[in-house]
Amino acid sequence: MENKWFLLMVRDDFKGGKITLEKALKLLEKLDIQCNTIHVKYIFKDNDRLKQGRITIEEFRTIYRIITYREEIIEIFNTYSENRKILLEKNLVEFLMREQYTLDFNKSIASEIIQKYEPIEEVKQAHQMSFEGFRRYMDSSECLLFDNKCDHVYQDMTHPLTDYFISSSHNTYLISDQLWGPSDLWGYISALVKGCRCLEIDCWDGSQNEPVVYHGYTFTSKLLFKTVIQAINKYAFLASEYPVVLSLENHCSPSQQEVMADSLLATFGDALLSYTLDNFSDRLPSPEALKFKILVRNKKIGTLHETLERKGSDMHGKVEEFEEEEEIEQEEDGSGAKEPEPVGDFQDDLAKEEQLKRVVGIPLFRKKKIKISMALSDLVIYTKVEKFKSFHHSHLYQQFNESNSIGESQARKLTKLAAREFILHTRRFITRVYPKALRADSSNFNPQEFWNVGCQMVALNFQTPGVPMDLQNGKFLDNGCSGYVLKPRFLRDKKTKFNPHKVQIDSNPLTLTIRLISGIQLPPSYQNKADTLVIVEIFGVPNDQMKQQSRVIKKNAFNPRWNETFTFVIQVPELALIRFVAENQGLIAGNEFLGQYTLPVLCMNRGYRRVPLFSKMGESLEPASLFIYVWYIR
């Protein structure tokens, strides 16, 4: 039956005799078979018996079966098929319920799957499924590891902004290093397309009264400020309808700050949030209330109430000066000092606060005078930048619309030594963590340690591939790639006792079991003979950081079989990410990266699942993937 269908599908292509590799590739595409051209080239060569660069219809059928008839899928099919030829509708129902854990299952779902994936018409009409149909279903998006529930906005978006992790970039204008690299609009466009919701704009005085964007005091190229925000306006809401925050690093004179203010108003129009929303004059609004809005994050003169009193007044030509304590950057001491007992709640005496300052190494400050155009200042509503001094100071004096920027070195020390106080701080105030200045190569830190304490804006260099950006992309797959992910309740509760370094004994851990079955057309290495292995990593609170590795399958990147089982006990699954990495074992220069996939642990489907692989730059490597079986219980 399947042979008859196959011959019917391809015979016209062989009317002229044998076909070339190019025609074979087109025919595979016609049959809806995704394949890696390099793999097909080697398979074609092996099956071209006369070595003439042309194959017969029988040779093509052999190639087709090598690519599509995977042994592990045949084994599953035969387990549920009564005659090893056809799945009855009831057989498919049994498979879906027992193996795929389709909890909201009804019989019509099985019927819909047959109608959608069964290519042989007479089989479809009989409400049955051939192996061809079953294989197509198993290779479809319905059998991906990522739960499609998480593929759309499903979380409550009416909480205040402080209750969300927000996808954030650092030095968004750069597409290379921070000393010589070019500034490019593509930095902003690509970040927005990926769902980034907080962009950084370094603004400096330019010629002809036109502010420019670049990395100051370096050889990086320059962009016009107005050109940057025009690009942002075009792409801001293509990937997500939720608010975009423009974090300004403002080094401009008051006159050019006015130019910036005028450009912002002219470019964004009503989308620019220049006044408080109704009912949100004393608390932060939600992403839902701020849909399709642009927020300016910058220093600000005076209070929000004073801004509202000036509503409608022309602020052009008006400049205010204030004195700010500028941080004198210090190196991390790297002493690895023993973690002291964390300080108590904010009502504890100031002696403990001073003790924490000495242990953590709160940076030194010096006075600095800053001039700000009132026209620009008044565009800052809910995201005023306020210098961070201490948790105690913020508790006493910081206002709801004031946010902090903390360098990674200081933030890391605070995370290790005062995690609970950090969580209580991020519960009330938006906190942005950014890479230290020494990262001239635009490298990134591990964002997980700052998500663990509730930091909303963990800003990374989006242009730099690697594990940190894999975690970033995986984290924000959740909630429909909207750029906003609701923080777990224990990071939002004002009475929280959560400490990522001291997970309570009565936590509710998740036991995760993954059976790594096989690889599917992994990116081929030298001569298509990669020695393939897979690493499965968990990122989360310190106790959840772990990884396991498969054995090496020699000289096989096309269809390696492992059949190995890994088990993880995850204490805080709400914060955990899982990363799958395929590598080619290297004996001298280290392992060669082949592909990876990262996603939140709680966004995984159970059952037989396909893990799509992505390149270092985050590009899809389809059809390269892993085939696994997932089970977890809590």
Swiss-Prot record:
SUPFAM superfamilies tied to this protein: C2 domain (Calcium/lipid-binding domain, CaLB), EF-hand, PLC-like phosphodiesterases
Assembly mode: Interacts (via its C2 domain) with PtdIns(3)P and, to a lesser extent, PtdIns(5)P in vitro.
EC number: 3.1.4.11
A Pfam family the protein falls into: PI-PLC-Y
Annotated PI-PLC Y-box domain residues: 376-492
Cofactor(s) required for function per UniProt: Ca(2+)
Every EF-hand domain range: 35-70
Class of the enzyme per the UniProt entry, highest EC level: hydrolase
Protein name: 1-phosphatidylinositol 4,5-bisphosphate phosphodiesterase zeta-1
Main localization (coarse): nucleus
Region annotation Disordered: where it falls in the sequence: 312-345
PROSITE patterns linked: C2, EF_HAND_2, PIPLC_X_DOMAIN, PIPLC_Y_DOMAIN
GO cellular component, one term: nucleus
Reaction equation(s) it catalyzes: a 1,2-diacyl-sn-glycero-3-phospho-(1D-myo-inositol-4,5-bisphosphate) + H2O = 1D-myo-inositol 1,4,5-trisphosphate + a 1,2-diacyl-sn-glycerol + H(+)
InterPro entries linked: C2_dom (IPR000008), C2_domain_sf (IPR035892), EF-hand-dom_pair (IPR011992), EF_hand_dom (IPR002048), PI-PLC_fam (IPR001192), PLC-like_Pdiesterase_TIM-brl (IPR017946), PLC_EF-hand-like (IPR015359), PLipase_C_PInositol-sp_X_dom (IPR000909)
Domain PI-PLC X-box: 155-299
Organism: Bos taurus
Taxonomic lineage from the root: Eukaryota, Metazoa, Chordata, Craniata, Vertebrata
